[in-house]
Amino acid sequence: MIQGTTSDAGKSTLVAGLCRLARRAGARVAPFKPQNMALNSAVTADGGEIGRAQALQALAAGVAPHTDFNPVLLKPTSDRGAQVIIHGAARMNLDARAYHDYKPVAFDAVLESYARLRAGYDTVIVEGAGSPAEINLRDGDIANMGFAERVDCPVVLVADIDRGGVFAHLVGTLACLSDSERARVRGFVINRFRGDIGLLEPGLDWLRAQTGKPVFGVLPYLHGLLLDAEDMLPRQARSAATRDGAGVLRVVVPALPRISNHTDFDPLRAHPQVEFTYWKSGPVPAADLLILPGSKSVQRDLQWLRDAGWDTVIRRHLRYGGKVIGICGGMQMLGRTLDDPLGLEGAPGSVPGLGLFDFDTTLLPHKTLKNVTGQLALPGAPAVRGYEIHMGDTRGPALAAPALQLAADDAAGGSRADGALSADGQLLATYVHGLFDTPAACAALLAWAGLDGGERIDYPALREASIERLADSFAEHLDLRALYAEFR
């Protein structure tokens, strides 16, 4: 089991790389995260949803994503509450205290999934959540040491040296553990190191002497990896680096407080002719394309946009010929009204949308979870492959001019319409996530938004190359023989 001294220490990445190495060695390997808290999720082959990191790890392992890989997923709806997803299906919304009482039920689901994976795979690589040293969460823990102790799983502790204080993180984490938990930690991995490894050696010697545990490796900081991020938005804007005379497309996405599935925009951030910005505050920069992203709390995030003046920004942008895309929750915001009669995302009630499309959305308790294929309603009808994750039912005249035609859900074939494309061709709305992942669709959308002579990129291929690069680095910098010996 891989546990971390902090959130974002590198647990997910370490599991992904180890999954790829196990696959290279011919093992049938599965990733497993007992409990995940994330707003970025993926649709599985068995029709549920799991954390995005586990979907990436499944890709690294060469297996189809399955709900057993992440049996408990918590999707925050507010600072104190979350939607609880068990075995891929939304069960209820709970605040933190109520979820604490529910944990024994959630733990049963965790153990069921783990047992199935142990029976079906040669190797299961487990990822913890956050840090095992959260004293206030120790009672009833199902994500870190509580799970490891229950199933007798050895632990490797990973720490991010790029943050600073790596030795304090490692030794301090051990100090917060019980004797049995501390004994369960077999050793350490230090992540994101830059510089001369020789200058780090005295610290590593001290760590070994202080703890009596080995350091299995020091992993270098790998720049330019294109791997799905699960929680944190990228810290910096992405500036285009183009050839002389090549076009540049400016794309701005508001960093909504409850933004979901921001992995939709990874292909744009990777595109050499896209200047990409997540807007958080201050003046909205000039843009060719504005994209309203998905949201786990659409009404609240819409109010946040209004408070920031984005309703005026969008209308001015359209007056000057700019293009706008709304994805999932962003699509719902573009309509006339948002109705939440059951209070699924907050207090029951209805709020006006931005009024740019003639349709209305009602939030319903049933969540749509589908992997989809189809074609964009743009020149050349480019192919699209993506997924739907939403609780909204949208209806209205604007849907008569759909943005996509998707393959029908049943065996009868045919197609079904999705989203809307405005009569003036400036607005596009869709429920489909992953819109830019397919090379042809990405190229067509960027051309529609105004990019002349755009380069076509294959984001899935770039992501696969990043996984390979990650595994190569691990093979070079980890003592795999010593690491594997602890787990046999």
Curated annotation (Swiss-Prot):
The active site is at 328 (nucleophile), 433. Keywords: Cobalamin biosynthesis, Glutamine amidotransferase. Pathway: Cofactor biosynthesis; adenosylcobalamin biosynthesis. The keyword Lyase does not apply. It holds the Pfam family CbiA. One of its GO terms (biological process) is cobalamin biosynthetic process. The keyword Transport does not apply. Gene3D superfamilies: 3.40.50.880, P-loop containing nucleotide triphosphate hydrolases. CDD domains: CobQ_N (cd05389), GATase1_CobQ (cd01750). One of its GO terms (molecular function) is ABC-type vitamin B12 transporter activity. Residues 248-441 form the GATase cobBQ-type domain. Transmembrane segments: none annotated. Belongs to the CobB/CobQ family. CobQ subfamily. NCBIfam families: cobQ, PRK00784.1. Catalyzes amidations at positions B, D, E, and G on adenosylcobyrinic A,C-diamide. NH(2) groups are provided by glutamine, and one molecule of ATP is hydrogenolyzed for each amidation. This is Cobyric acid synthase. It comes from Burkholderia vietnamiensis (strain G4 / LMG 22486) (Burkholderia cepacia (strain R1808)). The gene is cobQ.
